[in-house]
Amino acid sequence: VHWSAEEKQLITGLWGKVDVAEVGGATLGKLLVVFPWTQRFFAHFGNLSSANAIICNPVVKAHGKKVLTSFGEAIKHLDSIKETFAKLSELHCEKLHVDPENFRLLGNILIIVLAGHHGKEFTPSTHAAFQKLVRAVAHSLARVYH
């Protein structure tokens, strides 16, 4: 993936303001609510019986933070995203058997959450840069599947 200087600045500039715990928990929580079939990977997370139970679940929040911390690694290594996610791709494919479509869904939910948390700062240009990023991350995570 080729990144312009402007795209890199937009991504790193906004990411520096992201509360990884809050945004990560909200992103994973929304994924589990909006796409309930994804819950099958998280049955061991406890109460996932309702939208409120999922959003308030401390294990969902903690794992969301972990997911977004990992996503932050992509931002630190924009020029080597595939290499950055090689081991996670292998884990999700060979051990966890996660449908790679879920990576795209999670990225799209992240875009929505970022837009909600950052309002006017999440300009169309910032949105475009982050859309490119989540697409690159999803593709990298799905790499072992191909």
UniProtKB/Swiss-Prot annotation:
Cite the record's note on assembly: Heterotetramer of two alpha chains and two beta chains.
GO molecular-function terms, A-Z: haptoglobin binding; heme binding; metal ion binding; organic acid binding; oxygen binding; oxygen carrier activity; peroxidase activity
Q: Which gene encodes it?
A: HBB
Signal peptide feature range:
none
Determine the domain of life of the protein's source.
Eukaryota
PROSITE patterns given in the database record: GLOBIN (PS01033)
Could you identify this protein by its name? Hemoglobin subunit beta
Function (record text):
Involved in oxygen transport from the lung to the various peripheral tissues.
Matches recorded under PANTHER family: HEMOGLOBIN FAMILY MEMBER, HEMOGLOBIN SUBUNIT EPSILON
The chain positions of domain Globin read 2-146
Q: Where does heme b bind?
A: H63, H92
Q: In which tissues is it expressed?
A: Red blood cells.
Under Pfam families, the record lists:
Globin
Query: What does the record list as GO biological process?
Result: hydrogen peroxide catabolic process
What family does this chain come from, according to its entry?
A: Belongs to the globin family.
- Kindly state which keywords UniProt assigns to this record, in alphabetical order: Heme, Iron, Metal-binding, Oxygen transport, Transport
GO CC, alphabetical: blood microparticle; haptoglobin-hemoglobin complex; hemoglobin complex
